[in-house]
Amino acid sequence: RWKIFKKIEKVGQNIRDGIVKAGPAVAVVGQAATI
């Protein structure tokens, strides 16, 4: 039971980490697209 919960927690952290890292890149791409 707890293994599944820990796996979900780890995946959630990875997704959050990816969003935090991708955020600035997405903003830069968005600015480049509007120019």
Swiss-Prot record:
Q: Name one GO biological process term.
A: antibacterial humoral response
Asked if the record carries the keyword Lyase, the reply is: no
Principal place of residence: secreted
Which is one Gene Ontology cellular component term of this protein? extracellular region
The answer to whether UniProt assigns keyword Secreted to this entry is: yes
Superkingdom per UniProt: Eukaryota
The cross-references to Pfam families, in alphabetical order and at most eight, read:
Cecropin (PF00272)
- Modified-residue entries (Isoleucine amide), positions: I35
Which terms are listed as keywords in the entry? Amidation, Antibiotic, Antimicrobial, Immunity, Innate immunity, Secreted
Subcellular location(s) of the protein = Secreted
Main function: Cecropins have lytic and antibacterial activity against several Gram-positive and Gram-negative bacteria.
* Family that this chain belongs to: Belongs to the cecropin family.
The protein depicted here goes by the name Cecropin
Q: What is the lineage of its organism?
A: Eukaryota, Metazoa, Ecdysozoa, Arthropoda, Hexapoda
